[in-house]
Swiss-Prot record:
Ranges annotated as biased composition (Basic and acidic residues): 325-335
Record's protein name: Protein RecA
Positions with biased composition (Acidic residues): 336-348
Family: Belongs to the RecA family.
Protein species of origin: Listeria monocytogenes serotype 4a (strain HCC23)
GO cellular component, one term: cytosol
Task of the protein: Can catalyze the hydrolysis of ATP in the presence of single-stranded DNA, the ATP-dependent uptake of single-stranded DNA by duplex DNA, and the ATP-dependent hybridization of homologous single-stranded DNAs. It interacts with LexA causing its activation and leading to its autocatalytic cleavage.
Length: 348
């Protein structure tokens, strides 16, 4: 047994000498066993994710039909990163980002790094350069479907380019996954939905860009509109369901229901009323909502309005709900990792 241990120790020393300190270690000696996270900007989604937010150093895919709220979900995460003093980048391959809407969601557009690349290769090379800097906390690519290979852009209309985009994504993710993990960057890929022709049984819906993103993603979120939210005859927004269809860090298949209001994004008060009532932090009796035996509104909309006007009570309820769901922020790390991440520039 001693000979085996000595041989193992010798092998570990050789590996560390060749590849650097920390290239191999016992898991128990690793200082970062708990997964550090950054809030998604939505209480309901933080709870559905199971760890209180998006895991750092991982790839996230957000997909769904058109106008379902995918970009809104990503922009809320960017606002949360910036609020904690972090740096975020948005690669707008669709050339469709609305700065005014992003600002309404809390994004500091003056500090947001924005790129509107011409080709898929350019977009992914920019993404790699940003991640390798070690100074970007969140990177959003909107969207995978718009990452058009250079050969397709330079070719003629109607030319067949079979599998080009899938190969591009597969190669890019092989290069990106390791450095994303080292740099603790959260990479959010927004994706669209297509339908396979001739599918008789099962779900005909697929996401563009091949299968690589499905494999490399730690978390996959499906965003869908459930119903319209109306005030009289006017449509004010949508009730949206966000389903965690894949999760490597917590149990999957949880669903977060949020109100996405036009021009405002996710209603924090709406999800707070729902989640607080679920764990009896807020009591619901008939149509009345009450907190600490004080009525805060008749009907959900009035309770939402009360919390919007009384931010101190809203924050107090939010803190209690997070404690009930055991996502009180104990796994949050400072976003500024200091000099350590800069060594990524010298990798390879």
């Amino acid at each position: 047994m001693n000979d085996r241990q000595a041989a193992l120790d010798q092998a570990l020393k050789q590996i560390e000498k060749q590849f650097g300190k920390g290239s191999i270690m016992k898991l128990g000696e690793h200082s970062d066993q708990n997964i550090s996270t950054i809030s998604s900007g939505s209480l309901a989604l933080d709870i559905a994710l199971g760890v209180g937010g998006y895991p750092r150093g991982r790839i996230i895919e957000v997909y769904g039909p058109e106008s379902s709220g995918k970009t809104t979900v990503a922009l809320h995460a960017i606002a949360e990163v910036q609020a904690q003093g972090g740096t975020a980048a948005f690669i707008d391959a669709e050339h469709a980002l609305d700065p005014a809407y992003a600002k309404n969601l809390g994004v500091n557009i003056d500090e947001l790094l924005l790129s509107q690349p011409d080709t898929g290769e350019q977009a992914l090379e920019i993404a790699e350069a940003l991640v390798r800097s070690g100074a970007v906390d969140m990177l959003v690519i909107d969207s995978v479907a718009a990452l058009v290979p250079r050969a397709e852009i330079e070719g003629e209309m109607g030319d067949a380019h079979v599998g080009l985009q899938a190969r591009l994504m597969s190669q890019a993710l092989r290069k990106l996954s390791g450095v994303i993990n080292k740099s603790k960057t959260i990479a959010i890929f927004i994706n669209q939905i297509r339908e396979k022709v001739g599918v008789m049984f099962g779900n005909p819906e697929i996401t563009p860009g091949g299968r690589a993103l499905k494999f490399y993603s730690t978390v996959r979120l499906e965003v869908r509109r459930a119903e319209q939210l109306k005030q009289g005859t006017d449509v004010m927004g949508n009730k949206t369901k966000i389903k965690v269809v894949k999760n490597k860090v917590a149990p999957p298949f949880r669903i977060a229901e949020v109100d996405i209001m036009y021009g405002e994004g996710i209603s924090r008060e709406g999800e707070l009323v729902d989640m607080a009532a679920e764990v009896d932090v807020i009591n619901k009796s008939g149509s009345w909502y009450s907190y600490k035996e004080e009525r805060i509104g008749q009907g959900r909309e009035n309770a939402k309005q009360y919390l919007k006007e009384h931010t101190d009570i809203r924050d107090e309820i939010s803190k209690r709900v997070r404690e009930e769901y055991e996502i009180d922020g104990s796994n949050k790390e400072p976003l500024d990792e200091g000099e350590e991440t800069l060594s990524l520039l010298d990798d390879e």
